[in-house]
């Protein structure tokens, strides 16, 4: 819906609360729809005019199983615009803009700064601004001080998003919501707002605590994945099978928490350790474990690329097919930002400059696949025909369910299937001659003929 459907400013002023969600990506759009479904009037704003036009015309590219149906079935649908509403049309603003890191692994605050600069021209004393974006500790208060100097008394709260990409709309309506404010009034207003979603409110003592809660949640996941991935690299060097090691240690043992090894990508986990470190630096603290874990996980692509390049080095023009371009497959997502596939393409391209790269993903858009340097293919079969290397790069069910033996029959010779997730573990024992199967954490070869 376009914002022209809202009616006059006077009519909007009569509404109890009008929310303006700034940023309509994987965080902002589901939240805007959830609040609209709760009965609130919602204005969704994004500076990407094409995205706004797509939303107005019902074109939704988020891979979220509940989002599209929620938008169409919500009686009071959010309206969408490329510019902020006039002063007074909204009294609550939610910042959900992107907060990536730059080449120096520090916050790239361009989107946030632009949003704040625009907001200052719209805010009035007594408005409420909620930081939904993931930011370094101390950012929300710094933004609050900046706004106060320009506008006056504006309430600020930090209510971070902790949902999982691909299932955000459902999770924001069931996960406990962290709420921290710059004042008791700001916290109470933000808590009242999120209570409309029917979730438990976890009130914390200030905005810094709320920022920290979000960051350490992702950092602890990154650390656990890093331990599994370091074990996988150890197994590659010592001839062991990482899945056999981890599964055996897990069986019947109640204190085992290790996840399976595999790529760690996406727009959140790849940056949050750095944002965590940035917020702690003014206090003289360096989170060594968090930063080392990030280094380990970032090194998975390099580890895989070096192994693959050694296997394909003798080929004049190897064809490399990467299956699963999005940064993860479960829950499925179309997001390719910071995916292992993209980094693997860059590193293999440097090691095998003569290679041809094809890419296939069951949900990511072909233009997004092409933007990473792949020739996009419509089917997995089209991607692997005559290929010398096939990389299983995410764990989407459509990837893990592929008939590897049938696909292997279409490969060039010699060929290798390289599995980064353990999805086809054991399949190497049934492949035709000339086709090698290797897995991350199992470079020594197939340990057990127990899968397909």
Predicted regions and their residues:
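Structural/interface elements that position substrates and couple domains in central-metabolism enzymes
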Residues: 2-452
